[in-house]
A protein has these predicted regions:
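Acidic-enriched and Gly/Ser
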Residues: 2-10, 17-135
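Phosphate-binding/switch loop-helix module in NTP-utilizing enzymes
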Residues: 224-262
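Conserved catalytic network of the ASCE P-loop NTPase/AAA+ motor domain
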Residues: 145-147, 173-180, 204-209, 239-244, ...
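Nucleotide-state-sensitive switch-loop elements of NTP-binding domains
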Residues: 180-182, 191-239, 267-285
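P-loop NTPase nucleotide-binding/switch module
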Residues: 73-75, 82, 89, 102-150, ...
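Conserved catalytic/coupling modules of large nucleotide/cofactor-utilizing molecular machines
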Residues: 235, 257, 267-468
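Walker A/P-loop NTP-binding active-site region of P-loop NTPases
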Residues: 143, 147-202
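Residue-level signature of catalytic and energy-coupling elements of molecular machines
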Residues: 14, 19, 72, 94, ...
C-alpha cells in the first residue's frame, strides 16, 4: 500500500503538447529539473523536465516520437536523469545523444550506464597545462599553439574553412601522431551528416576508429537532441579521463550550434530572451559544458572547437560566451580566404594565452612576437602601396614590405584532407622547424626570393625544388 501511495504522489498528467515540448502537471510532489518523465502506459516514451511553467506545471522536452503522446496521458517521474552506455564497448562506435548506436553495428553490449549531467572537477583536482601539442600546421603552431589539456577555438563565418581545418587537426593529431594512451571523441552538434560520414570513412580507412567515439546530433534534429549531444560527448570524455585513466582529444563541430539549440528550446518554453536575443541562461549553459572539459589526475582533455560566427560578427553574444574558456583563438577571415591564402587565418586577429616563454620557449615566443610586429607594419605600408605604389616606399620599407609578404605566404600550407581538391599533397611541419624557418625569414635570409615562391611550401627546404 505504501508503494502505491508513493507512486501516486509522483504521478502527473500531460495538459498540452507543442511540437517537441509537452506541458506536464504534477499536483503534489515536485520533480527536479532534468528528471526523466515516462508515460505510465508506455515507459519507453520518455521526456526530460526542462523548466517550470506556472504553479505545479512544467515544460518537458519529448525524447521520443510525439505521436505516442496525447493530452491527458498519465506520466510518472522516474527520479533520475538521462543515462548513456559507457565502457570500452563504445569505442569505435557512432552514437546519438542518448547513446543509441546509429552505425548499423548492433547494440552496445555493456552493463555500465552513466548520467549525462555531472558536476565539473573541483579546483584542487584540475591539473595545470604545461606542454604544447604539435599540430603540424605552421600558422597554428607558431601563433596559436594548442596546449595539451587546453582549448583551441576555430572561429569564423560560413564557408571559410573551419570544418576543413578541424578535420585536418584530427588527421594530424589522431592519425599521424597517434598520441599514446589517448582516446578521441568527436561531437557533431548541429552540423551536416555528410561531414560526419566523411570523417567516419577516413578514421576507418586509417585504422584509428577503434580508439574513437563519434557522437552525432545533426542539424536536422530537434534542438533538444542537438543540445544534449554536447553533454553526451563530454560525459564520455570525463569517463575515459577519470575511469579509464586516458588522455582525451575532444573535437566539437559546432559549439555555436549548442548555444543556438539552447536558444530554440528557450523560445518554445516561453522564456523571455535577454537584450541581445539569446536565452538568459546562455552564460550558465555554456559554463556547464566548458567547465567539464578540464584535465584531471586521471588524464588530460585537449579540446578543439569549431565556432560559427553568424553574419561574420565576432561580437555576437553566443560567440563571446565561448571565448572566455579558450586558451587559443584562431580567427578566420573571408578576405584572406578570397585571396586564396589557406588556411584563411587572420594572424593579427588571432591570439593565444599559451604563447609565453615558459610554455613554448624563448626562441618560439620571440619569433612569433617579431613576426606579428612585422605583419602589423606591413598593414600600414599596404595602405601606402595601394595609393601610390610600392616603388614610392623607402628602401628600408620596401624590404620590410616584401619580407612580410614572404612570411604571410609561407604560412599557407597544403592540407591532407583536401588533397583530392587542391591536387597538392598534404604536408606536416614540426613546430620547431616552423620556428627555425620563421627566424630565418625575419633575418632576411630569403630576401632574394619572390613572395610567390613561398606559397604552399612546407619548409624553406622545398624552395629549391619549387624553383626547379
Amino acid at each position: 500500500m505504501k508503494n502505491s501511495e508513493a507512486t501516486l504522489r509522483i504521478q502527473g498528467k500531460i495538459i498540452s503538447i507543442r511540437g517537441q515540448v509537452a506541458e506536464v502537471e504534477f499536483p503534489e510532489a515536485k520533480p527536479r529539473l532534468r528528471d526523466v518523465i515516462v508515460l505510465v502506459d508506455d515507459p519507453s516514451t520518455q521526456m526530460e523536465l526542462y523548466a517550470a511553467s506556472i504553479r505545479n506545471t512544467y515544460y518537458c522536452v519529448v525524447l521520443s516520437p510525439t505521436s505516442r503522446i496525447t493530452r491527458g496521458a498519465r506520466v510518472i517521474n522516474r527520479g533520475s536523469s538521462v543515462t548513456i552506455p559507457a565502457g570500452k564497448e563504445v569505442l569505435g562506435r557512432v552514437i546519438d545523444a542518448f547513446g543509441n548506436p546509429i552505425d548499423s553495428k548492433g547494440i552496445i553490449e555493456t552493463t555500465e550506464h552513466i548520467p549525462i549531467y555531472r558536476s565539473p572537477l573541483g579546483y584542487h583536482e584540475i591539473i595545470p597545462k604545461s606542454e604544447i601539442l604539435d599540430t603540424g600546421i605552421k600558422i597554428i603552431d607558431l601563433f596559436c599553439p594548442l596546449v595539451k589539456g587546453g582549448k583551441l577555438g576555430l572561429v569564423g563565418g560560413a564557408g571559410v574553412g573551419k570544418t576543413t581545418l578541424l578535420t585536418e587537426l584530427i588527421h594530424n593529431i589522431v592519425i599521424l601522431r597517434e598520441e599514446e594512451n589517448a582516446i578521441s571523441i568527436f561531437a557533431g552538434v548541429g552540423e551536416r551528416t555528410r561531414e560526419a560520414h566523411e570523417l567516419l570513412e577516413t578514421l576507418t580507412l586509417k585504422g584509428v576508429l577503434p580508439r574513437t567515439v563519434l557522437v552525432l546530433g545533426a542539424m536536422g534534429e530537434h534542438p533538444a537532441i542537438r543540445f544534449r549531444t554536447a553533454y553526451t560527448a563530454i560525459t564520455l570524455a570525463e569517463y575515459f579521463r577519470d575511469t579509464m585513466k586516458k588522455n582525451v582529444l575532444f573535437f566539437v563541430d559546432n559549439m555555436y550550434r549548442f548555444a543556438q539549440a539552447g536558444n530554440e528550446l528557450s523560445t518554445v518554453t516561453d522564456v523571455i530572451p535577454s537584450e541581445d536575443g539569446y536565452q538568459p541562461t546562455l552564460t550558465s549553459e555554456m559554463a556547464t559544458v566548458q567547465e567539464r572539459l578540464m584535465s584531471g589526475r586521471g588524464g588530460m582533455v585537449s579540446t578543439v572547437e569549431a565556432i560559427y560566427v553568424p553574419n561574420d560578427d565576432v561580437l555576437d553574444q553566443a560567440v563571446q560566451s565561448i571565448f572566455v574558456y579558450l586558451d587559443s583563438i584562431v580567427v578566420f577571415s573571408r578576405d584572406i580566404y578570397q585571396k586564396n591564402f589557406l588556411p584563411a587565418i587572420d594572424i593579427l586577429e588571432s591570439h593565444s594565452s599559451a604563447l609565453t616563454p615558459d610554455l613554448v620557449g624563448e626562441k618560439h615566443y620571440t619569433a612569433a612576437f617579431q613576426a606579428q610586429s612585422l605583419l602589423k607594419k606591413a598593414v600600414k605600408l599596404e595602405r601606402i602601396v595601394s595609393l601610390i605604389g610600392e616603388s614610392e616606399l623607402t628602401p628600408e620599407d620596401r624590404i620590410l614590405y616584401k619580407r612580410a609578404n614572404i612570411l604571410r605566404n609561407f604560412m599557407t600550407q597544403p592540407l591532407y584532407v583536401v588533397e583530392d581538391q587542391s591536387h597538392r599533397p598534404g604536408i606536416y611541419v614540426p613546430r620547431q622547424k616552423t620556428v627555425e624557418d620563421t627566424v630565418r625569414i625575419l633575418a632576411g635570409e630569403f630576401d632574394n626570393y619572390t613572395p610567390d615562391e613561398f606559397l604552399y611550401i612546407g619548409t624553406t627546404e622545398n624552395l629549391h625544388a619549387k624553383r626547379t
